């Protein structure tokens, strides 16, 4: 009898423990992805940062100084997908924001889906291409679908990743109109951003925006006193065809996203209703302002960091006041890459050159025509991937593997090409040195030949209008990450941490299951 009673009490204690653990879960999870955030910049600016923004994360959170995504050629969407799913593009299906569509023979969003209609946009998107669950999805499952899950980002693909499959809403800024946009995939979009489109549209505010130094006349690190005193000034003209792109690369987009986030927290009751956990995921930008073509970008970039620091302080203060700091789990991570403007190679006599996509495709097609007869053998070039015409190869009864290998061997001889691989090369487990490439591609959307370019070379995609320039720079900059919440002690982790370890770690903190494609073990935190 005593044994039975003892067993019952142990079991009851276990049940109560589980209940207490569930009740002590955070009421609100706030996830922030900062595109191109660099550790060296926040460390260099530490003395100028406010106590309530980045410094609060650095001093009171778990501070990862180097998050490695382990894949080349990332962007905001693919990096967010790796961090949210704990899996690489090969598994999660998001190798980049744009993919080649063989039907239209053009680039489309990785999340293009004609099944749904756009809200305030002609774009038709859904998360159906995201093939695995996310950390956010698992929160929804653990809370039996009761969680409110919202995401806001300048970028459509990133907003969709951050909302996951179970998202209540996802909003982004339309590249053509500057409107806050969404998809009918999301059934309960908040009215705040919809009202902004009517009451305070971006197009009506652009002419009033003037970007000048936040601390004019004060010294900025590595900026001469003459530059600091003269400052800088950028305006946004509605007549500029690139005005929305410029806006989305300026600190103003971060401030607008912060204001929207604050309205969500105060107006939607996030983290205040019942015993469930709500989610608010945000995307911020710290990429180089597009107006620059050389090393003169550092003044503006440092200023963008200081402005984002103020935005974070404003957001954190709202969370403290509305939800309570002990009720919030907050994480902020860099996307782990940095796109620098091209250095003036001619002035400094540095190695480099220009790789013309149009010329390369034309030469490759001429080479294949000489071997196999007339036809357009190349369908498209996109981000280092060359897509051969499957229809033409089938029509001519050609072996696609052989043609891809011949194309690879032809392209690798071109100036500026460091190496070339077929999809079969990369997919072969026997080729160990291609492991990073293997992780980075989705075989369902990858090209037949993938090119690597020499550092210092500019890839000019002049096969489409307007042409797109991509500077090939292999220098790596550490990107930081932070996790802050009740029960986590401040600590600094200097060792490199793989991005795929973060979702399992966050899942352990939340005491929920990891995303279904995450195989890494959770990190042990204090």
Could you say what each language-model-derived stretch is?
Residues 1-25:
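Bacterial Sec-dependent N-terminal signal peptides
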Residues 38-44, 67-69, 121-127, 244-251, ...:
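Second-shell loop/turn segments in exported
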Residues 41, 247-273, 287-328, 406, ...:
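A long, amphipathic alpha-helix that forms part
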Residues 43-92, 148-152:
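Short, structured active-site-proximal loop/turn typified by the sulfatase FGly-forming signature C/S-X-P-X-R
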Residues 65-82, 151-160, 283-285, 334-336, ...:
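Short, solvent-exposed turn/loop segments enriched in Gly/Ser/Thr/Pro and often Arg
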Residues 75, 97-123, 132, 137, ...:
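Secreted, luminal/periplasmic, and some membrane-associated catalytic domains
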Residues 88, 96-276, 285-292, 415, ...:
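His/Asp/Glu-rich, glycine-adjacent segments
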Residues 359-398, 467-510:
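Substrate-binding rim/cap in mid-to-C-terminal beta-strand-loop elements of soluble/periplasmic
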């Amino acid at each position: 009898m005593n044994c039975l009673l003892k067993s019952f009490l142990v079991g009851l204690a276990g049940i109560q423990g589980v209940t207490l653990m569930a009740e002590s879960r955070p009421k609100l999870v706030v996830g922030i992805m900062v595109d191109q955030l660099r550790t060296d910049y926040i460390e260099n600016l530490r003395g100028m940062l406010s106590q309530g923004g980045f410094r609060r994360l650095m001093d009171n959170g778990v501070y990862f100084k180097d998050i490695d995504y382990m894949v080349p050629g990332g962007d905001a969407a693919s990096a967010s997908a790796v961090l949210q799913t704990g899996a690489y593009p090969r598994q999660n299906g998001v190798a980049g924001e744009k993919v080649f569509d063989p039907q239209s023979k053009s680039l489309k969003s990785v999340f293009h889906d004609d099944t749904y209609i756009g809200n305030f946009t002609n774009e038709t998107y859904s998360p159906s291409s995201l093939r695995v669950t996310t950390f956010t999805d698992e929160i929804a499952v653990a809370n039996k679908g009761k969680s409110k899950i919202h995401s806001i980002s300048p970028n459509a693909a990133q907003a969709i990743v951050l909302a996951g499959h179970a998202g209540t809403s996802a909003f982004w800024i339309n590249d053509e109109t500057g409107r806050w946009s969404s998809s009918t995939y999301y059934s309960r979009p908040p009215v705040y951003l919809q009202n902004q489109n009517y009451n305070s549209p971006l197009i009506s505010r652009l002419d009033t925006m003037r970007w000048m130094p936040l601390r004019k006349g004060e010294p900025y690190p590595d900026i001469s006193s003459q530059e600091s005193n003269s400052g800088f000034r950028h305006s946004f003209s509605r007549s500029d065809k690139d005005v929305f792109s410029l806006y989305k690369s300026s600190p103003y987009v971060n401030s607008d996203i912060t204001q929207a986030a604050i309205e969500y927290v105060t107006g939607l009751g996030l983290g205040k209703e019942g015993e469930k956990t709500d989610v608010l995921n945000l995307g911020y930008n710290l990429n180089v302002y597009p107006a620059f073509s050389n090393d003169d970008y550092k003044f503006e970039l440092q200023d963008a960091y200081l402005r984002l620091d103020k935005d974070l302080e404003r957001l954190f203060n709202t969370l403290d006041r509305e939800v309570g700091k002990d009720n919030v789990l907050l994480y902020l991570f860099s996307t782990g890459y940095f796109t620098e403007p091209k250095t003036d190679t001619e002035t400094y006599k540095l190695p480099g050159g220009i790789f013309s996509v149009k010329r390369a495709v034309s030469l490759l097609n001429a080479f294949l025509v000489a071997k196999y007869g007339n036809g357009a053998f190349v369908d498209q070039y996109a981000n280092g991937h060359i897509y051969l015409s499957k229809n033409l190869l089938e029509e001519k009864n050609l072996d696609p593997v052989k043609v891809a290998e011949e194309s690879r061997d032809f392209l690798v001889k071109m100036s500026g090409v460091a190496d070339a691989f077929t999809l079969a090369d990369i997919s072969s487990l026997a080729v160990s040195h291609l492991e990073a490439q293997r992780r980075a591609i989705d075989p369902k959307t990858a090209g037949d030949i993938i090119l690597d370019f020499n550092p210092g070379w500019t890839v000019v995609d002049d096969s489409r209008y307007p042409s797109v320039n991509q500077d090939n720079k292999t220098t790596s900059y550490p990107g930081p990450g932070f996790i802050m919440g009740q029960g986590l002690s401040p600590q600094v982790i200097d060792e490199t941490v793989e991005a795929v370890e973060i979702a399992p770690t966050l899942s352990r903190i939340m005491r929920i299951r990891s995303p279904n494609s995450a195989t890494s073990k959770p990190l042990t935190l204090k």
